[in-house]
Amino acid sequence: MMAKVSKRMKEISAKINAEKKYPVSEAFDLLREVSSVKFVESVDVSVALGVDPRKSDQVVRGASVLPNGTGKTVRVAVFAKGPAADAAKEAGAEVVGMEDLADEVKKGNMDFDVVIASPDSMRVVGQLGQILGPKGLMPNPKIGTVTMDVAKAVRDAKAGQVRYRVDKAGIIHTTIGKVNFTSDALKQNLEQLLTDLKKAKPAVSKGIYLKKVSVSSTMGPGINVDFSDLNI
């Protein structure tokens, strides 16, 4: 098994020049070329930003609605009541509730990928921080998951919204689709993400902001992308 893996890695290394910045479409073609697993891999992106994440005013976080989605089915839970709860259900939320939903979360019943909350439900949701927080599910107004318009938030989540937060090294990691997407679809998704990241640039960030962009498949190596010709 190890021999097979190392042989595959040698073949991949021969095809990808780690020092080169590849045109976007060529990078996506390469991803498909080196993908040899039996499932449809996600296309992940890492963006190195010119920020110091140790400083609170340089923590970049937010959300981006990708025009071509992520290729994933997203299950949404919403904390809301009254008309807001009805609107969330109509928008396609799988689970909607208040104290009853909180009880399910406390029991560990969390068959959902995104949690959205109306502002008046935060008294209930606030008690679940230690459960939802470590799983990256805690609603937050900065990424649009605490909102008066829960229906729009549900639709955005279903349409392929990705959330991001800069890590300690100043890098954003997220997904922009699947390897079976067309190169144009992946390019449009990447352009949307980078456009939204530029809008989220902290005022105190100096010098080059978008420093490096690389793409990879789930099991594949990173490929550096020349993003200078993108529409961002």
UniProtKB/Swiss-Prot annotation:
One of its GO terms (biological process) is regulation of translation. Transmembrane segments: none annotated. One of its GO terms (cellular component) is cytosolic large ribosomal subunit. GO terms for molecular function: rRNA binding; structural constituent of ribosome; tRNA binding. Pfam families: Ribosomal_L1 (PF00687). The keyword Ribosomal protein applies. The keyword DNA-binding does not apply. PROSITE patterns: RIBOSOMAL_L1. It comes from the Bacteria. Gene3D superfamilies: 3.30.190.20, 3.40.50.790. Keywords: Repressor, Ribonucleoprotein, Ribosomal protein, RNA-binding, rRNA-binding, Translation regulation, tRNA-binding. Belongs to the universal ribosomal protein uL1 family. Binds directly to 23S rRNA. The L1 stalk is quite mobile in the ribosome, and is involved in E site tRNA release. PANTHER family: 54S RIBOSOMAL PROTEIN L1, MITOCHONDRIAL, LARGE RIBOSOMAL SUBUNIT PROTEIN UL1M. Part of the 50S ribosomal subunit. This is Large ribosomal subunit protein uL1. It comes from Francisella tularensis subsp. holarctica (strain LVS). The lineage of its organism: Bacteria, Pseudomonadati, Pseudomonadota, Gammaproteobacteria, Thiotrichales. The gene is rplA.
